[in-house]
């Protein structure tokens, strides 16, 4: 080892030290910074889309609950049927639009079928599926209730004959309020046509939501397709990954907890 004339070790010059540091830790290129920036931006967009989809599913869940309360009110003597049917139509139309938007956003952020799936995406799939199933069930209930009350009114008109005003008022307290029992025959026919139109519109919306439910099940990620309904309720908090077959050597059996 070379040494200085006074016995001290010769230190490397500044140029040598700078070259050593440059070799040991090269600076980041412009492409590396671009990749890092694009990755964080993509993650931010995905999280924002996930939050939007979560809000849509929650709002759709609220619309389903509101529609269910309206269906329960069918036949209540304290509720005016024309206003009730108008509110049901408004709530049903808004709920169908929310369901379509939620399905589109959820399908856009779900990613590849055999890749890693965020647990929140799995939860949104299950929530949207349950809401759609309940939504179509409530539509079917409203169709049955409106149809039965319509049939009850027509049967009463056919067999009633001429009745006094007092008897009509007395029966009105016990008859479901599909329409005003004191209305004229012309008003009765018009309201009967409106009820039939509402039933047809509800049947159309129900078919559309059933088709949307079928599309949702088709686009559902594979880890959710391969599980039954009971296992879907117990989701792991970790990302779900498609299971692949593995070989184990030297084991007679494998018991999974």
UniProtKB/Swiss-Prot annotation:
A lipid is attached at residues 252-253 (S-palmitoyl cysteine). Residues 32-45 have a biased composition (Basic and acidic residues). It is found in: Nucleus; Cytoplasm; Cell membrane. GO terms for cellular component: axon; cytoplasm; dendritic shaft; dendritic spine head; glutamatergic synapse; neuron projection; nucleus; perikaryon. It is a lipid-anchor. A motif (Nuclear localization signal) lies at residues 242-247. Keywords: Cell membrane, Cytoplasm, Lipoprotein, Membrane, Nucleus, Palmitate, Signal transduction inhibitor. Residues 1-45, 172-191 are annotated as: Disordered. Palmitoylated. Undergoes rapid palmitoylation turnover. De novo and turnover palmitoylation are both mediated by ZDHHC2. Palmitoylation regulates the cell membrane and nuclear shuttling and the regulation of GPCR signaling. Upon depalmitoylation, it is targeted from the plasma membrane into the nucleus. GPCR signaling inhibits depalmitoylation and promotes localization to the plasma membrane. One of its GO terms (biological process) is regulation of postsynaptic membrane potential. Its main location: nucleus. InterPro entries: RGS7BP/RGS9BP. It comes from the Eukaryota. Residues 180-191 have a biased composition (Low complexity). Interacts with 'R7' family proteins RGS6, RGS7, RGS9 and RGS11. Component of some R7-Gbeta5 complex composed of some R7 protein (RGS6, RGS7, RGS9 or RGS11), Gbeta5 (GNB5) and RGS7BP. The nuclear localization signal is both required for nuclear localization and palmitoylation. Belongs to the RGS7BP/RGS9BP family. Regulator of G protein-coupled receptor (GPCR) signaling. Regulatory subunit of the R7-Gbeta5 complexes that acts by controlling the subcellular location of the R7-Gbeta5 complexes. When palmitoylated, it targets the R7-Gbeta5 complexes to the plasma membrane, leading to inhibit G protein alpha subunits. When it is unpalmitoylated, the R7-Gbeta5 complexes undergo a nuclear/cytoplasmic shuttling. May also act by controlling the proteolytic stability of R7 proteins, probably by protecting them from degradation. This is Regulator of G-protein signaling 7-binding protein. It comes from Rattus norvegicus. The gene is Rgs7bp.
